[in-house]
């Protein structure tokens, strides 16, 4: 089981805080550092010091880390034109020496679009499909060749399709709970399918839909990696679990029901159950980015048991 650190900087985190967490995750042996792509905090609090841009953040981390993979859950398709996104991700991949992964979604949080003057079109899913076709098409076009695309929402003419990523293929993540269109899109474009904040039962059903869609698309169902994103709250004892839950404003029993919470042994057991239904990666949503002892505990007493 591959454990990855997943952060929500819009809730209140500077670049320096994210750098500290990414370096700690790398030093502790985690395989990847991911972040959300949001410009407005959610729920209680003020979100200070304010949002950080996902790909500017990852560009900085690319130069200040050595091994850990870097990515987004998920880049909002509404924030970026597909040609520009292809350039940005390819450049960050070059800057990292080939450690970037792209999670791309349609965008869903209307309030942040209103807050920063970003259009929030009704046809987000149709745009997402064209964005995936364009980004992957640009990267797959040979050097010296031209890329053209004539879609409903985007048109590209005689694009040199540069720059190229350092990797031969940047892994693409697609995720969500949708029962029909999401599995089909994953089958067409994804290297990994991720379902966020889902129960074992719902995860198993959605993985099954994606596997069926992959087969229908002529792919092997096992060609994709299947993963979950779950909030994490681990403590050496009940008091420590309760303290960590309180800091992030959550109830312990709710966290145990909907995430990965409890003692290291309890969390290892629950992760194992996700593994049994086909998940091979867990993105650990870490909400208190100042608590590096939490990461150390997960590394030494959860990750070590799973490895």
Task: Mark where each language-model region is.
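Active-site-adjacent structural elements that line small-molecule/cofactor binding pockets in enzymes
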Residues: 1-307
């Amino acid at each position: 089981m591959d454990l990855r650190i997943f952060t929500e900087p819009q809730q209140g985190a500077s670049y320096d805080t994210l750098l500290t967490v990414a370096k700690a995750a790398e030093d502790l042996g985690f395989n990847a550092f991911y972040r959300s792509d949001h410009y407005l905090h959610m729920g209680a609090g003020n979100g200070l010091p304010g949002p950080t841009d996902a790909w500017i953040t990852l560009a900085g981390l690319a130069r200040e880390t050595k091994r850990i993979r870097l990515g987004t859950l998920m880049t909002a398709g509404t924030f970026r034109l597909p040609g520009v996104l292809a350039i940005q991700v390819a450049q960050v991949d070059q800057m990292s020496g080939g450690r970037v992964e792209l999670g791309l979604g349609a965008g869903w949080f209307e309030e942040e679009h209103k807050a920063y003057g970003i259009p929030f079109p009704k046809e987000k899913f149709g745009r997402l499909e064209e964005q995936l076709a364009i980004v992957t098409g640009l990267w797959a076009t040979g050097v010296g060749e031209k890329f053209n695309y004539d879609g409903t929402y985007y048109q590209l003419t005689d694009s040199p399709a540069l720059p190229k990523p350092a990797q031969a293929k940047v892994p693409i993540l697609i995720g969500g709970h949708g029962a029909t269109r999401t599995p089909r899109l994953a089958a067409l474009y994804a290297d990994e399918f991720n379902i966020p904040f889902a129960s074992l039962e719902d995860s198993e059903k959605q993985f099954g839909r994606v596997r069926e869609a992959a087969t229908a698309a002529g792919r092997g169902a096992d060609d994709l990696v299947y993963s979950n994103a779950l909030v994490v709250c681990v403590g050496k004892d009940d008091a420590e679990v309760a303290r960590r839950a309180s800091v992030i404003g959550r109830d312990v029993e709710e966290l145990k029901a909907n995430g990965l919470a409890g003692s290291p042994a309890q969390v290892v057991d629950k992760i194992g159950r996700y593994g049994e239904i086909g998940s091979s990666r867990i993105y650990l949503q870490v909400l208190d980015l100042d608590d590096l002892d939490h990461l150390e505990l997960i590394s030494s007493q959860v990750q070590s048991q799973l490895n």
